[in-house]
Amino acid sequence: MLNSLDLEGRPQDTRVVVAMSGGVDSSATAALLKSQGYDVVGITLQLYDHGAATHRKGACCAGQDIHDARAVAERIGIPHYVLDYESRFRESVIDSFADSYALGETPVPCIECNRSVKFRDLLATARELGASALATGHYVSSRRLDDGSRALICAADRDRDQSYFLFATTREQLDFLRFPLGDMTKPQTRELARQFGLSVADKHDSQDICFVPTGRYTDVVERLKPNAMEPGEIVDLNGHVLGSHPGIVHFTVGQRRGLGIASRAPLYVLRLDAAHRRVVVGPREALRMERIVLRDVNWIGDGAIDQAVGDGLELFVRVRSTRAPQPAWLRAVGGGYEVELVAGEEGVSPGQACVFYDAADGQARVLGGGFIKSAAPRWSADGVRDDAASPALAAMRG
């Protein structure tokens, strides 16, 4: 007989570690599992030097959060531990964040944190404590498959769905993870927290990168990668110099405001050339990308990825966490993987994730994804389709 977490045994005989960030979501998760009779242990990771972020409204993982998590644990009567992971977090997340920006990318540190810290080290700690599962407050679900493994499923509340940030979860990790809030909305979670008498029921949602206390990511990059602040040229698609800039770290793909150059027509950042310290700008139509080259691909669909992809796999992808899944094709090309966006997408930025889904709506299954290495436009600068860079995609288009 399986319990409500799809685990063998009675709840009272099942230990579950809850990753408690100090926010309402993870707090409600811990309280809910405790009320269902599980043997709950709360763990909070101290990830960075809190400093100026300690009491800033909307910050995540700040010093106040540790206090809040401890207070919730005391309220619901569970043991609570704080683990110092500052060194690991700095090496795995903060340093790579700065490196990525210095390369002209737009990183997603939450994905790296989940992959390199929370779902690796914290999961290992949960096992050492004799837990049968690690539960989090993410808005995402998992479903038990016929073979006993688990599939990652989008949250019922699509406005809160966090599946984009969890695509790098491995199959082994997914089998051990549980997401009790996957079928709930945020208002329902807050109401649940009120029913349990939790002090964080009305706490502000985290909105910022937790280790950027001022809200200015450039401060972090400047401190760790000062070369990213070196000035350079702003050029058009033909290489004509239009102006200068104080450092590529100040720009992102798709940006229009703050370019500091005069033009009769609106110009947008199309590409960041870190090697030459150049910001390439052009018209909005040049932002539309059709082909994406991926790196660090993770597959959590059925079977092996090569068998699933074959000569081409039709699926849906998200290239930003705030965008809806769009139809695409996934293909194996030259020892790696490429995605063709059927309708194209604007503002596809290297460093972001391209996440695979089996459907565009409803509680779709996450099939995996990869990080965007590069993207090619629907049209080249001279108005010709850019098929030459990918023979496989050119053949598919006919």
Curated annotation (Swiss-Prot):
Active site (record annotation): C113, C210
Residue span of region Interaction with tRNA: 160-162
Which reaction is the catalytic activity of this chain?
S-sulfanyl-L-cysteinyl-[protein] + uridine(34) in tRNA + AH2 + ATP = 2-thiouridine(34) in tRNA + L-cysteinyl-[protein] + A + AMP + diphosphate + H(+)
Q: Where does ATP bind?
A: A19, M20, S21, G22, G23, V24, D25, S26, L45, G137
Compartment(s) where it occurs, according to its Swiss-Prot or TrEMBL record: Cytoplasm
Name the domain of life this protein comes from: Bacteria
Which GO biological process entries does UniProt record here? Answer: tRNA wobble position uridine thiolation
Q: Where is this site: Interaction with tRNA?
A: H138, Q352
A GO molecular-function term, please? tRNA binding
Alphabetical keyword list: ATP-binding, Cytoplasm, Disulfide bond, Nucleotide-binding, RNA-binding, Transferase, tRNA processing, tRNA-binding
Q: Which InterPro entries match?
A: MnmA-like, MnmA-like_C, MnmA-like_central, MnmA-like_central_sf, Rossmann-like_a/b/a_fold
Q: What does this protein do?
A: Catalyzes the 2-thiolation of uridine at the wobble position (U34) of tRNA, leading to the formation of s(2)U34.
Q: What family does this chain come from, according to its entry? A: Belongs to the MnmA/TRMU family.
Q: What is the name listed in the Swiss-Prot or TrEMBL entry for this protein?
A: tRNA-specific 2-thiouridylase MnmA
Species the sequence originates in: Rhodopseudomonas palustris (strain BisB5)
